[in-house]
């Protein structure tokens, strides 16, 4: 490939790199095809040269054979050798030229590839530019449409404004022909407002109607609807169909009602009736001796002067039958108490569920304990029974209140057995009622025989105390 061809290729490449014509890719493809054809031609020439080299080698062998066989042909062979040498030199020069051409082609191929890459980039940029140009054309078309629309709308507004101005001119002419510029008698013009001059005795009502002002005039005259009328009290007066003032029916009946009252009037009263008047109120009253009579539930009753005797327990008055009898709660009455028996000591305390039998005999309350086994006790301490709850039906907490506060109220001996390691040791405890507070009864353990133990077996025992609460 000669220098002029390379120079021409470079010019074409430069023109393609600068040009933005969309046909550049086709021209590059044509160049690539032409280069490929040249490469193919060079390769075919190399193949032919290789064939010539082999033929020359064959000829050299033939010449050597001829030289060995034909000595007499030396001069001719020398001439042939010179020719062969020249041919060989020419072939070598051709080979070098072909090699140089191959190197130049190899150098051109990367540049052609680079040119292909640049061409691809140019193609992408050209496509982007074409897309941007298309978008600009679309926006320009939309803008053109909007401008056309706005121009049309402005034309419409201008036409409408011209019509409105024409209408305003016509209306202004009409106003000018009918406009009030001066006010006559009884009227006053204030700017664009025409006022009615109202003197004393006139006013505008809530409906903006001009009426007579009677507020400072005679009483009893006013307006009803659109007319002026005489004011009346409708409780006693009314207008008839002729507009005359008449009495209402209640007033018309007054004479007959007064006559009825006069016919039933009591002119005087006789004792024990009296008439009293206070603060304008007349009251008919019945006179009676308050020491003998009294008024109970608005009924005059005879006052009893008898003094009823008082009764002490066990007697009581049966007011229903007006008789004196022995109180129902006097005599013997039985019941039960079920709850927790509490043992209290500074060093020991426990609770046990028990049921006590109660018996009220005259003024004494008997507590009967059944046999039971409890936890251990100390040498003293106290047992507590709470009668606030647990009493059987018919018994009240107050029924257990002692009649005295002496400590102890009463005492008794309780037989017990102290249980210790399977042994039973007979003993007794001295028990006494010591205190009763708000339904809580305390039974003290005042002592007795005592020994170490783990449990206590209690034989049945009773204790009683005076209980004649009145």
Swiss-Prot record:
Keyword match Glycoprotein: yes
Keywords carried by this UniProt record: Capsid protein, Coiled coil, Glycoprotein, Hemagglutinin, Host-virus interaction, Outer capsid protein, Viral attachment to host cell, Virion, Virus entry into host cell
Residue span of region Head: 325-470
Record flagged with keyword Amino-acid biosynthesis: no
Cell compartment(s), UniProt: Virion
Region entry Tail, spans: 1-324
CC per GO annotation: viral capsid; viral outer capsid
An example Gene Ontology biological process: cell adhesion
Glycosylation sites noted in the Swiss-Prot or TrEMBL record: 21, 121, 205, 353
Modified how: Undergoes dramatic conformational rearrangements during viral disassembly in the endocytic pathway.
InterPro entries hit by this protein: Adenovirus_pIV-like_att, S1_C
Coiled coil (UniProt feature): 26-46
Function: Fiber-like molecule that attaches the virion to the host cell membrane by binding to the primary receptor F11R/JAM-A and to sialic acid containing proteins (coreceptor). The interaction of sigma-1 with F11R is required for NF-kB activation and apoptosis. Binding to both sialic acid and F11R is required to induce maximal levels of apoptosis.
Protein family according to the UniProt entry: Belongs to the orthoreovirus sigma-1 protein family.
Subunit and interaction comment: Homotrimer. Interacts (via the head region) with human F11R.
Protein name as annotated: Outer capsid protein sigma-1
Species in which this protein is naturally found: Reovirus type 1 (strain Lang) (T1L)
